[in-house]
């Protein structure tokens, strides 16, 4: 029997056991072929309510377990990602359209997230405070309770596990709503891993579903923290609802990240980073390089080199062919990408490479003559499109990079590292890389953006995870009962 044997999960949701979904089921479609890979259970709002109540009950016992027990579950989970990597890799390639290297990276990060989370239960937290009274005064970190996680399709495993693992390690229970398009990699796989790792029943729930289930998750009285990754528009709705219900929402949203190429850059070295930043996973990453800002002295050569590289990147089925780009997730997303490309041409940009597609396979595209007022430059494309604009001074580069509603990632290519860091300090983003492109992720590194990219670094590393998934409680102790003049 395979680890992801569909007899377990077909038409079911995970609530500590595999139960029939009240919302029916939906096809799991392979974007590259249109083939049906299985049928995943779709939760209803009623399923969500039942799971949230069950999770709240299970959380109390889970929080009371020793830190050694919780750490052991997370370590076993990390081992399981590695033990079943071959099968899980195939699912990532087929369900999400990942090339093999991207699937390997997701599995590596999933294991690392669990191993890092395994250190959280024994991580020293809290403070001993001075007190005006003769007593011991402390600030302690305690579990938040039930954590709701809403994860997207593009990196389904990473963007689920980075919240699920630390939340569980810190004594919370979790209700996870993966995107139905990638519900196996972003949901079923996590349920199976933690089921086999020995997580007590009821502590993790996996409920694929639509917007109605997401809304019910945010509104449910048992859920105290929401961790959401997705579009800025959807994130606004989540944040507004969470605010009305007086609960915290950690929002990791869209981006339109800039890669700045200074006049002293080595273009031979820069090309690999530039292409990777815009075309990795078909540009379907929040950190994707959405704007290439190139010094005027290098601009023409940069466009020519990037267009040449883009035109030689093979596109096709990553499960059966050796390709650099796989499929776009679905026709709706492909049409959005192409609409932005065509409207950008109408606005004056020139297609230097790509700009065409077959089925869901969109070719790596370079748009020369881009800049403010060009749609693919101004907006998040979420596709393999590289708009290239020019600047003539550091001041202009900083101004152009900062003129965005987003503030997620930034890359700067330069021979002068100090100059690059000084420029980065002038541009408000949550992430900055000197001599690297914009797409980077590590389990230990704080991750998040500013402005319309989200509510800051709430993922990655012990400090961010403890802040995200615990509450601070003030506790005092004294040997005698305090007396008062009443």
Curated annotation (Swiss-Prot):
Applied relevance: Vanillin is toxic to the cells and hence it is subject to catabolism caused by the oxidative activity of this protein. This is undesired from the production point of view of this important compound. The deletion mutant of this protein can be used in production of natural vanillin by microbial fermentation from ferulic acid at final concentrations and molar yields on an industrial scale.
Gene Ontology molecular-function annotations: oxidoreductase activity, acting on the aldehyde or oxo group of donors, NAD or NADP as acceptor
Catalytic activity, EC: 1.2.1.67
pH dependence statement: Optimum pH is 8.0 for the NAD(+)-dependent oxidation of vanillin. Active between pH 5.0-9.0.
Keyword field: NAD, Oxidoreductase
Induction line: By vanillin and ferulic acid.
Reported phenotype of the disruption mutant: No growth on vanillin and no vanillin dehydrogenase activity. Degrades ferulic acid in a similar way to wild-type. The deletion mutant produces higher vanillin concentration being provided ferulic acid for the synthesis of vanillin as the mutant is only very slowly oxidized to vanillate.
SUPFAM superfamilies: ALDH-like (SSF53720)
Protein's job: Catalyzes NAD(+)-dependent oxidation of vanillin to vanillate. Also oxidizes other aromatic aldehydes including benzaldehyde, coniferyl aldehyde and cinnamaldehyde, but has a preference for vanillin. Not active with NADP(+). Involved in the degradation pathway of lignin-derived aromatic compounds of plant cell walls. Catalyzes the conversion of vanillin to vanillate due to toxicity of vanillin to the cells.
The protein's name in its UniProt record: Vanillin dehydrogenase
Keyword hit for NAD: yes
Site (Transition state stabilizer): 154
Active site: 252 (proton acceptor), 286 (nucleophile)
Top EC group: oxidoreductase
Family matches, as InterPro entries: Ald_DH/histidinol_DH, Ald_DH_C, Ald_DH_CS_GLU, Ald_DH_N, Aldehyde_DH_dom
Record family assignment: Belongs to the aldehyde dehydrogenase family.
Binding site for NAD(+): 210-211, 230-231, 252-254, 380-382
Influence of temperature on activity: Optimum temperature is 44 degrees Celsius for the NAD(+)-dependent oxidation of vanillin. Active between 15-65 degrees Celsius. Retains 86% of the activity after storage at 4 degrees Celsius for 24 hours.
Catalyzed reactions: vanillin + NAD(+) + H2O = vanillate + NADH + 2 H(+)
């Amino acid at each position: 029997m395979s680890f992801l044997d569909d007899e377990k999960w077909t038409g079911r949701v995970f609530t500590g056991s595999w139960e029939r979904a009240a919302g029916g089921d939906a096809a799991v479609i392979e974007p590259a072929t249109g083939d049906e890979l299985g049928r995943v259970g779709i939760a209803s709002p009623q399923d969500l309510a039942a799971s949230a109540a069950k999770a709240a009950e299970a959380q109390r016992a889970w929080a009371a377990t020793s830190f050694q027990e919780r750490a052991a579950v997370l370590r076993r989970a990390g081992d399981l990602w590695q033990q079943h990597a071959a099968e899980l890799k195939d699912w990532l390639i087929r369900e999400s359209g990942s090339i093999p290297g991207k699937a390997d990276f997701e599995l590596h990060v999933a294991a690392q997230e669990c191993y890092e989370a395994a250190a959280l239960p024994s991580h020293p937290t809290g403070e001993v405070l001075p007190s005006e009274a003769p007593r011991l005064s402390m600030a302690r970190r305690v579990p938040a309770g039930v954590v709701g996680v809403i994860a997207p399709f593009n990196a389904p495993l990473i963007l689920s596990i980075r919240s699920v693992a630390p939340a569980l390690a810190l004594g919370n229970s979790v209700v996870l709503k993966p995107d139905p398009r990638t519900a196996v990699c972003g949901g079923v796989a996590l349920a199976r891993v933690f089921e086999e790792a020995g997580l007590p029943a009821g502590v993790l729930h996996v409920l694929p579903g639509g917007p109605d289930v997401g809304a019910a998750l945010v509104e449910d009285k048992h859920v105290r923290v929401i961790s959401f990754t997705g579009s800025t528009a959807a994130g606004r709705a989540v944040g507004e609802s969470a605010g009305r219900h007086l609960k915290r929402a950690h929002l990791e949203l869209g981006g339109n990240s800039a890669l700045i190429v200074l006049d002293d850059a080595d273009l031979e070295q820069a090309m690999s980073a530039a292409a990777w930043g815009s075309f990795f996973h078909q540009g379907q990453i929040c950190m994707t390089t959405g704007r290439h800002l190139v010094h005027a002295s290098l601009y023409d050569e940069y466009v020519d080199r990037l267009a040449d590289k883009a035109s030689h990147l093979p596109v096709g089925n990553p499960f059966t062919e050796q390709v650099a780009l796989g499929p776009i997730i679905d026709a709706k997303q492909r049409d959005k990408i192409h609409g932005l490309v065509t409207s950008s041409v109408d606005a004056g940009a020139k297609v230097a490479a790509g700009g065409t597609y077959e089925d869901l396979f969109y070719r790596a595209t370079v748009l020369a003559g881009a800049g403010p007022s060009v749609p693919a430059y101004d907006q998040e494309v979420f596709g393999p499109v590289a708009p290239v604009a020019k600047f003539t001074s550091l001041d202009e580069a900083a101004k152009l990079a900062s003129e965005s509603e987003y503030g997620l990632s930034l890359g700067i290519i330069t021979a002068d590292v100090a100059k690059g860091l000084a420029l980065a300090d002038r541009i408000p983003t949550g992430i900055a890389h000197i001599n690297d492109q914009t797409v980077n992720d590590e389990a230990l590194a704080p991750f998040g953006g500013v402005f319309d990219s989200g509510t800051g670094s709430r993922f990655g590393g012990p400090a961010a995870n403890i802040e995200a998934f615990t509450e601070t409680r003030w506790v005092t102790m004294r040997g005698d009962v305090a007396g008062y003049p009443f």
